[in-house]
Amino acid sequence: SEMCIRDRKDIQEDVETLHSKAFDPLGLSTDTTLDSSGAHKMRSGKEEHLYNPQTIHLLQLATRTGDYKTFKEYTALVNKEEGVKNLRGLMNIKFPKKGISIDEVESVDSIVRRFKTGAMSYGSISREAHETMAIAMNMLHGKSNSGEGGEDIDRLKVGPDGLNRCSAIKQVASGRFGVTSRYLVSAQEIQIKMAQGAKPGEGGHLPGKKVYPWIAKTRLSTPGVALISPPPHHDIYSIEDLAQLIYDLKNANKNARISVKLVSEAGVGTVASGVAKAGAQVILISGYDGGTGAAPRSSIHNAGLPWELGLAEAHQTLTMNGLRNKVVIETDGKLMSGRDVAIAAMLGAEEFGFATAPLVTMGCVMMRVCNLDTCPVGVATQNPELRKRFTGKPEYVVNFMRFIAQELREIMADLGIKTLDELVGRTDLLEQKNVAKSGRSAEIDLSQILDNPYVKQTKIHYDKKNVFDFELEKTVDEKILLKKFESAMETGSKRSLEIDVANTDRTLGTLLGAEITRRFDDKLDDDTYTVKCNGAGGQSFGAFIPKGLTLELVGDSNDYFGKGLSGGKLIVYPPTGSTYKEDENIIIGNVALYGATSGKAFINGVAGERFCVRNSGATAVVEGTGDHGCEYMTGGTVVVLGKTGKNFAAGMSGGIAYVLDEDTSLYKRVNKQLVSMEAVSNKYDVLELKQLITEHVAYTNSKKGKEILDNFGEYLPKFKKIMPHDYKKMLNMIVQMEEKGLSSEQAQIEAFYAATK
């Protein structure tokens, strides 16, 4: 209770100090101008930062000259004991009297394979910065992370110059930007981002002025229109849903490790245990010091916890539940030195992510304008003129990673430890040091982190023989589809097949689709391979299927139908003799076509909630939808031949929806914040609508579709065209630029500049 009172007194004093600076209740003419404390942007003589002019200069000098001695000067400043800035600053490493020769320690080349660069999207940082990190990490056989913004197709294979610009880790975030079959197949590791260290609970946000045409092309969105990822993944509302997404992604690339990114928080150990049971091979515990570039300041300074807390809890909880040797634990969040990595390993980490430090080696000077597109060194900007100032090279990032590994080896040699695996979980080599005589630091107790009852267990790191078994050999794809289509894929000839399915056949068609992508990219003609399925489709039917593959389902399907559709075609209709009315028969479940990027879907029945959420480019025809249809949509075309649920088109910033409004009540159910609702009058719109309904009837034999086509003149006035304001404005501007004689590409650029001035 005494400690509690003292803590409250500290807090009270802080509040009173700030209050007295902001108010003058007695009218004493006190200057209430608030001076900058330097908490966010560094100010001379104010709050100290680990990245300051001195450390930034030394780090850049060391990595650009390849001088390890200068790097040691940098880490000496970072690790100095005065003014503790993080929890690891309160820890001592307990060295024995005698270590071992550094020649006996695991090599630099081996250690750097455990290093990764953090998830920074192409869009938040420049192409030059993004590619430089990818090249560097591929040179080291480590891994770079694409972030959530997709990746240009020309980077997915080794370039003509022999450089590999492909990010080994492909991230799948709630926005699903650029998540295609090709994107997933190119990955060595696929990371599901549940949250971000600096802003847990918030979705990603790319301001409109950073959505240049080339970014919009990669993300399949509209230039100049801000991109906001939903706060949750709409296919993850429970741990079972997460297990389903992990399974989907394993089917989309059976050779990739599946990783789940969590944020350090109280209780993260319980979540990590669930994630391990769900089949993830890597669990990332992200600290609050990371990912601060464009996060809101309120989140940067008030949300998240240090990685030391979450990492220790996750490691101990997984060990306690007998799950530790099934997964790799990774951590990130301002790892700056070999000492930081050593302590992270002792607390339970086996792999390590770096983000800010590689940016600094490439030229970042911590101007804190990442979200403004005004980065003066060409790192966090898309502005072509500012990008010319980029001076980074892959060699600088390589030097940084190798220097970190070398410093780590020196610590391991002094500890008498030969391999990094032997260091994992060795909290007995750490102790709390008493550097603070007063203030809150003096009250900190690290015993829950350091007193690990499982520390004497030697096998407390990942062992590949314990990896989760997805039993893919039992899937319909492996047992039937891949075998039946093998000869056709070898020759590129057309082939069709008819099979029976049950709702236990999850993620049907995805393994086959991934193999088609590996062999043909997206170059096949439509309907090259067709599978007619009779029965009930399971979860994630047709997820991520590519161009050339058609799945025709006579029956119904569960949730996540057509998730991430990547050019394939999906057709669903009830069996002959069905007595249900199509516009009253819910034939597919919730969250269909989530994150679809291209392809077509024709559904002779009603879809559940969140139909086409985050659709980026697919075309779909359906006979009705549940609530929140077309939510967060950025591209593509949707035709609804019946009623929608409430909140239709919420967050929709691109694409077009045509909705049949027979009782003129649609206006009550549309979220009008971002969209307009108008009659279908443009001749091109009329032609498009009629063509899509014609295709729908041809594929599904829809009675409603036939009736509309037979009486098209009568039904046309009942259709409403729903289109986002900004999307419409941008398309009109592009047309105006093209009328001036500009090419399509140049017209987009000029329209973007005109819209974002």
Language model segments and positions:
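Glycine- and acidic
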Residues: 111-123, 224-233, 251-258, 292-301, ...
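Terminal or standalone catalytic/regulatory effector modules within metabolic enzymes
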Residues: 10-168, 227, 426-434, 439-558, ...
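Long, distal/terminal scaffolding or interaction modules
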Residues: 386-387, 398, 411-415, 424-427, ...
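Short, small-residue-biased leader/transition segments that mark boundaries at the very start
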Residues: 2-5
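Mobile "lid/hinge" segments at catalytic clefts and subdomain interfaces of large enzymes
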Residues: 7, 186, 191-223, 348-442, ...
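Generic recognition of stable, solvent-exposed alpha-helical segments in well-folded globular domains
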Residues: 10, 50-54, 66-69, 110, ...
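Alpha/beta enzyme core
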Residues: 179-332, 337-367, 373-381, 514, ...
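Generic, well-ordered alpha-helical scaffold segments in large soluble proteins
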Residues: 77, 118, 132-143, 245-252, ...
